[in-house]
């Protein structure tokens, strides 16, 4: 029976916790990637990645952009598979999706104090993404 990406990542975290109980979880990788990382993972040039991302308005937006840009690998892989018909390794796609969701959830757990401001920010995020806002 094939192990899922979730099961593999859960097992890895569990094993580290067993061996090093005081270990602090920082981030699951691969998740955030730049153009060079993407080129290496996909097997093409950095220039090709730049063209793909800058010449197509449907390309995923970076989650960080200042001196350089970072994207969630899962977003890019899904887009390349669906919009550009790239043959993407499904295990890499699954692992990157689990890692992205895990990292986002861990960050939320670390920062969310469940205050009225936190609840308002969650509503604001829903509005920004889904145009749904519930007034509290």
Labelled PLM ranges:
Residues 73:
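Conserved G1/Walker A P-loop phosphate-binding module
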Residues 43-70:
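Major-groove DNA-recognition helix of helix-turn-helix-type DNA-binding domains
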Residues 27-51:
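Polyanion-binding surface elements
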Residues 1-16:
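Short, intrinsically disordered low-complexity segments
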């Amino acid at each position: 029976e094939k192990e899922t990406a979730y099961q593999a990542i859960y097992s890895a975290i569990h094993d580290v916790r067993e061996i090093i109980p005081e270990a602090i979880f920082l981030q699951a990788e691969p998740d955030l990637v730049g153009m060079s990382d993407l080129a290496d993972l996909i097997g093409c040039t950095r220039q090709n990645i730049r063209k793909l991302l800058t010449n197509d308005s449907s390309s995923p937006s970076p989650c960080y952009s200042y001196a350089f840009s970072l994207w969630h690998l899962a977003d890019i892989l899904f887009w390349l598979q669906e919009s550009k018909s790239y043959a993407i390794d499904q295990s890499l796609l699954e692992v990157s999706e689990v890692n992205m969701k895990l990292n986002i959830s861990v960050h939320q757990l670390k920062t969310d104090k469940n205050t009225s401001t936190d609840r308002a920010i969650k509503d604001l995020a829903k509005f920004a993404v889904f145009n749904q806002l519930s007034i509290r």
